[in-house]
């Protein structure tokens, strides 16, 4: 575990209700910031430099893009060392593939997320590089 001021930041964008991974994020060694919309997450990225970004992918119907995550993933270009994990409903796998073709992410996990898989990934990403 990192000392309190030395722990890396994890920004979680939780638009799908029904789960709380904050305790798991903290156990993996992160300071945690949670936003409930991409718009608020984009505002938060003006003052926060996260090591990990965890975002929900939910299929929304936009006329010009697959998801509002496109804006978030584009903003992540300012943080080249940040790791991006997308949590998704398996029913939207083809829509997620479209998004990832435009804006790559480091990993995806289907909902409901298996805590052990998430924890292993986060512990690996929490280690200093």
Where are the regions that the model predicts?
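Structural motif
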Residues: 11-17, 56-59, 87-90, 111
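Non-catalytic signal-transmission and effector/linker regions of two-component phosphorelay proteins
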Residues: 1-24, 73-81, 114-129
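Proline-centered flexible-loop/turn and helix-kink motifs
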Residues: 50, 80-81, 104
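A generic structural motif
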Residues: 28-32
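Short, aromatic/basic amphipathic alpha-helical patches
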Residues: 21-27, 71-72, 95-103
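Acidic, metal-coordinating helix/loop segments flanking the phosphotransfer/catalytic sites
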Residues: 36-52, 62
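Conserved phosphotransfer microenvironments
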Residues: 52-79, 88-95
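Output/docking surface of receiver
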Residues: 34, 65, 87-127
């Amino acid at each position: 575990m990192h000392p309190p001021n030395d722990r890396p930041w994890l920004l979680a964008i939780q638009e799908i209700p029904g789960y709380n991974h904050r305790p798991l994020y903290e156990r993996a060694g992160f300071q945690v910031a949670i936003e409930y919309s991409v718009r608020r997450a984009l505002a938060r990225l003006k003052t926060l430099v996260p090591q990990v970004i965890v975002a929900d992918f939910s299929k929304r119907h936009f006329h010009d893009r697959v998801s509002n995550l496109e804006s978030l993933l584009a903003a992540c270009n300012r943080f080249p060392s940040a790791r991006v994990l997308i949590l998704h409903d398996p029913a939207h796998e083809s829509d997620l593939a479209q998004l990832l073709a435009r804006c790559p992410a480091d990993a995806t996990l289907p909902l409901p997320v298996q805590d052990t898989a998430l924890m292993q990934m986060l512990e690996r990403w929490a280690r200093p590089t």
